[in-house]
Each structure stands twice: as structure tokens, then as C-alpha cells.
Amino acid sequence: MILIKRYGFPLLLSLALYTAVYFLFGNGSPYLGIALALSVILSYVIRICDDIGDYEKDRAQGQAPIRKSILVVMMVAALSVFGILTLVAKAYIMLISPTVILLQFLIKDKYRDIIKPLFLPAIVVALVLSFFTPNFWLFVTVPILIISDVILIVFKRRRRDL
């Protein structure tokens, strides 16, 4: 139940975005599904990394509902799916770089070393396959979900510190 409560928001928000675009623009775009899938996966990665970074503090307060090993497995699985989707979607380096920079601020110590090599193949593939032609759906939906996740994380940390 805690997994659904904690990680259900990105999926619901992406479905809401897809529904809104579908009704506003007719059938939407084939790129919309790719953009939303990337958005959801990046959103999960950000949330999982935040949970891993705060695990010790949560455990000390008795609020760690999930074991750390499960969180690490979830993170590796999400990054693997993201890498595969990057191969399929020919995601752009401009999309991946801000995510890596953002994750650097959220992740602590040794877990930062786990993240970097997992993102490197996606970055290399994006450089090779990308023609650097901007895609509207990728550059609109992904930042919306990433910004919403960062806002939620900031509020969560402020609430915990009070």
C-alpha cells in the first residue's frame, strides 16, 4: 500500500496530462506516449533516489516502510527501463543532462557512484542517435513532472524537519 501511495502520483499525473492533450488536440501524438513514459520513469527514479538518500534519517525516526535493498533494486530497475526506452525513443542529451544534474543534488555519497555509470550508456546512445531536432512533447511533459516531483520532495523535507 505504501508503494502505491508513494509512487502512484507520477502515473496519475501523466495520465491526466495525456487525457488533457487527447481532448485538446484530438488523437494526440505518438511522441506523447514516449514523453509520458520517460516522464514517469524519471519521476520514479527521482523519488526512489530521494527515499534512498533519506533512508538513514527515516530509519532513525522509525518511519522507513521499505527496506533499503528493495529501494536499490527499484532504482536499478527504473534506470534500466529508462535506458532501454532511451534507445527506443532516441531521447535527446538535453533531456538527460538536467536529470543527471538534479539527481546529483538528491543522492548522497556512494549511491551517487551507482547512478553515474547507469546513466552513461543512455547519454552515449542519445548523443549517437539524436539529430538534435527538438520534440515538443518531450520538452513539455518531462519538465512538468520533474518540477512537480522536486516541489513534493522539498515540501516533504520541510514537513519532516518541523
Model-identified regions with their sequence ranges:
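Short juxtamembrane and helix-loop transition motifs at transmembrane-helix boundaries
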Residues: 1, 52-66, 79-86, 101-110
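Topogenic membrane-insertion module of multi-pass membrane proteins
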Residues: 1-46, 93-98, 103-138, 150-162
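Solvent-exposed interhelical
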Residues: 40-78, 150-162
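C-terminal halves and exits of single transmembrane alpha-helices
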Residues: 73-93
